[in-house]
Amino acid sequence: MMKKILIVDDEPNIVMSLEYAFKKQHFEVFIARDGSEALEILQHQIPDVVLLDIMMPNVDGYQTLTKIRENDSLKHTKVVFLTAKNKASDIEKGLQLGADKYLTKPFSVKKIISEILELVT
């Protein structure tokens, strides 16, 4: 069965390269530009994993993760932060809120793919 991923990031170049890479890995890919868009998609789709930026307009990644973790139907969905926020305190906060992994930008697409595959297979 095809795995589903929701990519949440406000940087179009990042979204495009990740979307392409995950489609090549036979993922069904959903895209949101911020947390509120992501939460809207999550009302209709239950992805295997959400790849989530933190610094976004409207609803940020921390708020989005909190809402995801409050939703019972998403309890099996893995959430991975992919963000430029790389201080120890940022990482600690992300993991305390319930992220399954915390990855930082800049990144290698190959590494992101392998980290995600490790979580969902």
Spans of model-derived segments:
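Acidic, metal-coordinating helix/loop segments flanking the phosphotransfer/catalytic sites
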Residues: I31-V49
